[in-house]
Amino acid sequence: MVEADRPGKLFIGGLNLETDEKSLEATFGKYGRISEVLLMKDRETNKSRGFAFITFESPADAKAAVRDMNGKSLDGKAIKVAQATKPAFESGRRGPPLSRSRGRSRGLRGARGGGPRRPPSRGGPADDGGYAGDFDLRPSRAPLPMKRGPPPPRRAGPPPKRAAPSGPARSGSGGGMRGRAPAARGRDGYEGPPRRDPPPPRRDPYLGSREGGYSPRDGYSSRDYSSARDARDFAPSPREYTYRDYGHSSARDECPSRGYGDRDGYGGRDRDYADHPSGGSYRDPFESYGDPRSAAPARGPPPSYGGGGGRYEEYRGCSPDAYGGGRDGYAGGRSERYSGGRDRVGRADRGLPQSVERGCPPPRESYSRSGRKVPRGGGRLGSRSERGGGGGRSRY
């Protein structure tokens, strides 16, 4: 924009770098009296930057100079002469501070606004469970719900149940696992984060197989299976699937109903779990349980984690150990974890073979789901048919 305060100011561009203020004044002085000649120079070298500003006392003289001198040659270079606008360097100096302050205020506003905005999203899961919004003000939002998970009255009863079975089973794997399972239980305390739970299983399989006790899996499965126990109290849908299929055999319902029953009953979760947690971590558990007995071969498979089929073949290879010894150990430890004293009583009645069968079929189901329906004898097909039919299960 034309400088209103200096209407007689002209911009002269395209100057020869040798042109100085004196030559400019001599050239433009013939149009009128010049009040100022400003040749822009480089600060460091003090050389001309090739443009200048000349201010005439009379705007009319300035217009005449523009009319006559624009495009003319000065010191061998064609120059541009025009009415001066707010110079870029001035507006640049003035502008950036404004924009910077604007940006800063925006940034502060964003930080101030975004801060509060972001925490609710992080605290959202906690709010799902009815936790107080004060979590939003604290940095450690996720851990706090976990710590406060057990208190919610809904689950106040079930966690002890969980603790009872998981305690004995986990005693072999160490106290750290006990710590983790309570955290998991805490997550059970509210409904939102269980949606976040499936990711931990995917990490857990490796932890589990590494630790040998795969207690994180216990944490997860105790979450899952004990919630099946809770499901008996307030989640009829698992029962509908499992009891319809298997009859009311408590311990056996317990293990299949929630963890493996999820695979059988809930189609979507079945595939998901069979591919990931069950494919990797339920199988890894078998390996880690079989490992104490003689699953050194079974230890190898965890890396092949994703492909249920290959893993299943390896299970067939080490099935005497992983499914035999490990299966008993697994069914013993694992089903004790999941079904607690009830399972132990049932196992005493039924004897180990059925606990074996109890521990074993679910993975078979998951493997057969992965597309490898390798006939494993009557036990495998029988167990699957029992799962499907329900009559076979109710026999026990």
Swiss-Prot record:
It is found in: Nucleus. Residues 84-396 are annotated as: Disordered. The modification N-acetylvaline is found at residue 2. Residues 148-162 have a biased composition (Pro residues). Residues 8-86 form the RRM domain. The modification N-acetylmethionine is found at residue 1. The modification Phosphoserine is found at residues 91, 335, 355. Keywords: Acetylation, Activator, Glycoprotein, Isopeptide bond, Methylation, mRNA processing, mRNA splicing, Nucleus, Phosphoprotein, Repressor, Ribonucleoprotein, RNA-binding, Spliceosome, Transcription, Tumor suppressor, Ubl conjugation. The modification N6-acetyllysine is found at residue 30. GO terms for molecular function: chromatin binding; mRNA binding; RNA binding; RNA polymerase II cis-regulatory region sequence-specific DNA binding. Residues 336-396 are annotated as: Necessary for RNA-binding. There is a cross-link at residues 22, 80, 86 (Glycyl lysine isopeptide (Lys-Gly) (interchain with G-Cter in SUMO2)). Residues 185-205, 241-275, 334-350 have a biased composition (Basic and acidic residues). Coiled coil: none annotated. GO terms for biological process: cellular response to interleukin-1; membrane protein ectodomain proteolysis; mRNA processing; negative regulation of mRNA splicing, via spliceosome; positive regulation of mRNA splicing, via spliceosome; positive regulation of transcription by RNA polymerase II; protein homooligomerization; regulation of alternative mRNA splicing, via spliceosome. One of its GO terms (cellular component) is extracellular exosome. Residues 323-332 have a biased composition (Gly residues). The modification Omega-N-methylarginine is found at residues 122, 141, 162, 170. Residues 186-236 are annotated as: Necessary for the association to nascent RNAPII transcripts and nuclear localization. SUPFAM superfamilies: RNA-binding domain, RBD. PANTHER family: TRANSFORMER-2 SEX-DETERMINING PROTEIN-RELATED. Homomultimer. Found in the supraspliceosome complex. Identified in the spliceosome C complex. Forms a complex with ILF2, ILF3, YLPM1, KHDRBS1, NCOA5 and PPP1CA. Interacts with CLK2, KHDRBS2, KHDRBS3, SAFB/SAFB1, TRA2B and YTHDC1. Interacts with ERAP1; the interaction is RNA-independent. RNA-binding protein that plays several role in the regulation of pre- and post-transcriptional processes. Implicated in tissue-specific regulation of gene transcription and alternative splicing of several pre-mRNAs. Binds to and stimulates transcription from the tumor suppressor TXNIP gene promoter; may thus be involved in tumor suppression. When associated with SAFB, binds to and stimulates transcription from the SREBF1 promoter. Associates with nascent mRNAs transcribed by RNA polymerase II. Component of the supraspliceosome complex that regulates pre-mRNA alternative splice site selection. The RRM domain is necessary for RNA-binding, but not for splice site selection, indicating that its splicing activity does not require direct binding to RNA. This is RNA-binding motif protein, X chromosome. It comes from Bos taurus.
